[in-house]
Amino acid sequence: MCASRLVLLLGLLLCVGAHLSSGQHWSHGWYPGGKRELDSFGTSEISEEIKLCEAGECSYLRPQRRNILRNILLDALARELQKRK
C-alpha cells in the first residue's frame, strides 16, 4: 500500500515538474528561440530587396563562374607552391 502511494506521488511530481520546466519567459516582441517579430525591422527594405530579386537583378543569386574558376586556379597554384617548398 505504501509503495503504490509512493509511485503515485512520484508520477504526480514527474508530471508537474515536466510541465513547469517547459515554461519559458518571452520578452516583449520576442518569440521562442530568440526570434523577433518581422514588423520591428524595416520591412520596406526587405520588400525592396525582394522586388529587385524578382526582377532578376540579384547578383548574389547568379553564379560567378569567372570568380569560381579563378579561385580554383589560385588554390591549385598555392598548393603547388607549398609542395615545392
From Swiss-Prot:
Keywords for the protein's UniProt record, in alphabetical order: Amidation, Cleavage on pair of basic residues, Hormone, Pyrrolidone carboxylic acid, Secreted, Signal
Sequence positions bearing Glycine amide: G33
GO MF term (any one): gonadotropin hormone-releasing hormone activity
Pfam families: GnRH
GO cellular component, one term: extracellular region
Signal peptide extent: 1-23
Keyword Kinase: no
PTM annotation (Pyrrolidone carboxylic acid): residues: Q24
Similarity-based family: Belongs to the GnRH family.
Function: Stimulates the secretion of gonadotropins.
Protein's recorded name: Progonadoliberin-2
Organism the protein comes from: Verasper moseri (Barfin flounder)
